[in-house]
């Protein structure tokens, strides 16, 4: 197998709501709220008309993109034996992704992200991790990891104790490790640990400019470049409209992004960028072509609704 992803198996449930629904339920518009009470989450969900249900999760989105580009890819996650779990499984099978899953028959439901779309197209997300947040080292196949060229992980796995053990097992058995820092708040929560991973454990790090700035407490972007040069590892940083940059030792490669796109949804931009870049990387393309493929995939996904092509 070319690449194996390990991450939170989350089903995205999309529903259209009005502004009053956001206010009435004490939600902060255009942000993500993590729910810890299952009953509270289910009460919110049952009052809505579901427009669309699709398999999601950051690393899983990237893995699907890699499979769509023709590479053999797999995913390790945790779902429940329920309707959303079945939807998740079918979503990956449809995209020819090999799924090394653990399916629970009782207890917590499959992880769900409720995406509330207001008339102005803004998205407010409500997430209940459910079974996804319970992935552990026993769910991670050492054999599958050892047979994969690259393991791709998400920083979100550090938010729970058991997933962190799965993360550590993957790193210790992998041939090569790539990781997405996930988001700014995730970096802030785990800064010392992430810094150690970037310096000592990871072969490839994906981050946006804000995440890297926070990670090393940089004052300028040049500080990020200089920090990355010293590591002699591949650091890939996206910069929004400024494009993207890859630093590997003294090699610094940049690329631009397409301008004047009709942007509908930025949700999957980073996930699909990573998919395009890793596709190029595992097929031994020059770094510039890896960056170009990443920006191409990212540009495509932001012009549609949803995080998968």
Across the structure, where does each feature detected by a protein language model lie?
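Glycine-rich phosphate/adenosyl-contacting loop at the front of the ribokinase-like
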Residues: 1-76, 86
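Conserved phosphate-binding/catalytic region of the ribokinase-like
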Residues: 3-9, 23-30, 47, 192, ...
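Active-site nucleophile and cofactor-binding loops and adjacent substrate-binding regions
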Residues: 50-58, 103-107, 267-268
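Hydrophobic beta-strand scaffold residues
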Residues: 73, 99, 177-178, 235
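A glycine-rich helix N-cap at a beta->alpha junction
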Residues: 91-108
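Conserved phosphate-binding/catalytic loop of the ribokinase/pfkB sugar-kinase fold
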Residues: 100-105, 115-161
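A short, aliphatic-rich alpha-helical micro-motif
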Residues: 144-146, 198-199, 229
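Conserved beta-alpha-beta core of the PfkB/ribokinase-like small-molecule kinase fold
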Residues: 150-225, 242-244
